[in-house]
Amino acid sequence: MEVKDRNVSIHGTSLRGQIRADYATLVRLLGEPVPGDQYKTQVEWAVRLYDEETGASTVVTVYDWKQGDCYLGEGNGTAPEDVTLWNVGGYNGNAYYHLNTLLMEMREAA
């Protein structure tokens, strides 16, 4: 499983689960995030994961839902760099499964 595309349409994706990971780990795994809507999300990743063995791909979104100052008020939120619980979205449950697999592979390799 590898990150194939960092510029994907996420229209129609929805929450599939949550992961625990620090910001730096996600940056190493998925690249730099893009700004979120600055209301309920501060940053987000939207990527396509590709499985070389099967040829299948999965769109995955990762975002900090309602954790920042933009939602909770100035001084009450958590900076993206300090977030450790992230929402995972996609078109189906494969998004959560494949992202978790990729995270476990990265952690085992470290």
What do these predicted regions represent?
Residues 32-67:
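Amphipathic, interaction-prone secondary-structure segments
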Residues 15-36:
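Amphipathic alpha-helical segments
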Residues 64, 101-102, 109:
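Extracellular, modular beta-sheet/disulfide-rich ectodomains of secreted and cell-surface proteins
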Residues 60-97:
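Intrinsically disordered, low-complexity regulatory segments enriched in Ser/Thr/Pro
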Residues 17-24, 55-56, 95-99:
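Short, conserved charged micro-motifs
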Residues 1-21:
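N-terminal trafficking/processing presequences and adjacent post-cleavage segments
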Residues 19, 49, 88-90:
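Short beta-strand-to-loop capping motifs
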Residues 1, 107-110:
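Short intrinsically disordered terminal tails
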